[in-house]
Amino acid sequence: LATPATMGRVSGFGWGMGYLGGIVLLTILLVGFIFPDPGWFGVTSEGAWNIRLAMVLSAVWFAVFALPVFFAIPEVPADEASPVRGLFSGYRELFRSLRGLWHESKQTLFFLLASAVFRDGLAGVFTFAGVIAARSFGFDATTVIIFAIAANIISGIATILGGMFEDRFSAKGVMTASLVAMVTGLVLVFVLAPLGPWVFWTFGLMSAVFVGPVQSASRSYLAKLIPPGREGEIFGLYATTGRAVSFLAPAAFTAAVALGGTSLFGILGIALVLLIGMILLLMVRESPTTSVTK
């Protein structure tokens, strides 16, 4: 789907459209079924039918927009049929893959570790933003939803633009600059919080701008590091390592709140996770290949 010269744009466009498409659906559901009572087609909140129908429409939306993947996207055929393995043999294969990466491509393994950390920090930004907005800045539920919509729209557009910058400069440069900007924005939210809600609107959205570009650039950067012929395996490890450290941001947030005494201190916990991930990223040496562009 991409060449080395267009990998950033393709990844950024795909990830950015995911943000924008999700917001379009969310807006339809909020305007059509969640906020009004009754909503479209006379659906009411009695028995939570508006929520039920929203879930059904979400499933239909997913199915419809998944169809092009099955019918229009070319796929590189597998070299050979993979044998069916049991649960425990799958774990053995996982550790065998990690051991093989240590010997064959240490930089790929280092990046998997770094990205797992900062991606959990990114998840923490969206997970706890609503909590901080409500408890520390007095946002009501409607304002939190409006902020979330604005954050996703901005991040979607920024992700598409970030892909272009990635092709012009480098994926690692985009990730590093974005992480620096996010940490800066979060610290400013913490420091300037006494000035009022405009601080969260301004610097919270500033941080949200850079979430998508990091996610997109992380994916395309990994594609350039993967040893030829191991694309599916390594992207599987990419997903696995991300889930393996998914406790980091919640733990850091909880610890910071416990130490500081208010939810506002949780921002520093999330910023710390992002900072650690960025430091680990800086230790990864760039040795890209073009294995995914065959």
Residue ranges: model-predicted function:
Residues 61-72, 268-294:
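Multi-pass alpha-helical transporter architecture, strongest
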Residues 74-112:
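Juxtamembrane intracellular "pre-TM" segments in multi-pass secondary transporters
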Residues 180-194:
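C-terminal ends and interior cores of transmembrane alpha-helices
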Residues 157-171, 257:
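Helix-to-loop junctions at the C-terminal end of transmembrane segments
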Residues 127-144:
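Short amphipathic helix-loop junctions that connect adjacent transmembrane helices
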Residues 1-2, 213-226:
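Intracellular juxtamembrane helix-capping segments at the cytosolic ends
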Residues 11-33, 239-249:
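Glycine-rich segments within core transmembrane alpha-helices of 12-TM secondary carriers
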Residues 31-60, 255-274:
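A membrane-interface helix-boundary motif in multi-pass transporters
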